[in-house]
Amino acid sequence: MKVLITGFDPFGGESINPALEAVKMIPENIEGAQVIKLEIPTVFRKSLEKIEEKIEEINPDVVISIGQAGGRFGVTPERVAINMDDARIEDNEGNQPIDISIYEDGESAYFSNLPIKAMVKEMVDNGIPASVSNTAGTFVCNHVMYGVLYLVNKKYKNIRAGFIHVPYIPAQVVNKPNTPSMAINDIAKGLELSIKAIVLNDNDIKTVGGAVC
């Protein structure tokens, strides 16, 4: 099995992106699966183009994209991506699409086909704070998740794909009072455990993972 895992470069004035740094730290072989790592730009369209180029090159079985979600307390596999770009800030090339469909011929939303609840359970069972997230936002993270799942539905039908958001690391919150963070080693371990769960679970488990609001 080949797993392509991507991480964004820093954005929004940050000098580091824990998503990318954690991706760099994970093993290149997990439960017999080959892990291929890819840095992508925090830029609308270009991020997707780079992922599709890599898909064409290596023909992966799984594509997982990792992004930073400052303010979250744990590692959060995403359930769904919506067909909407609505950028609160500019991307790294100054683009700021507002209320724009990602693909005009795409569905309103696509759901991850990764075993997200099994991933959360694997992390929690090993001491990593984790939960299912039901919103990937409307910035480049959602753009990438939606775009990859669009490609999976239209073109690469045998690929399993999804997205994981990770918290800030402590160095990023020194001047952000009362903002949660997680050690980079724990984030990397969470990603490794998530890949383990993907390799070992063709189908997701049935367990509570929803939210009241």
UniProtKB/Swiss-Prot annotation:
It comes from Clostridium perfringens (strain 13 / Type A). It holds the Pfam family Peptidase_C15. It catalyses: Release of an N-terminal pyroglutamyl group from a polypeptide, the second amino acid generally not being Pro. Disulfide bonds: none annotated. One of its GO terms (molecular function) is pyroglutamyl-peptidase activity. It is an enzyme of class 3 (hydrolase). PANTHER family: PROTEASE FAMILY C15 PYROGLUTAMYL-PEPTIDASE I-RELATED, PYROGLUTAMYL-PEPTIDASE I. Homotetramer. It is found in: Cytoplasm. Keywords: Cytoplasm, Hydrolase, Protease, Thiol protease. One of its GO terms (biological process) is proteolysis. Belongs to the peptidase C15 family. PROSITE patterns: PYRASE_CYS (PS01334), PYRASE_GLU (PS01333). This is Pyrrolidone-carboxylate peptidase. Its EC number is 3.4.19.3. The active site is at 78, 141, 165. Removes 5-oxoproline from various penultimate amino acid residues except L-proline. InterPro entries: Peptidase_C15, Peptidase_C15-like, Peptidase_C15-like_sf, PGP-I_bact-type, PGPEP1_Cys_AS, PGPEP1_Glu_AS. One of its GO terms (cellular component) is cytosol.
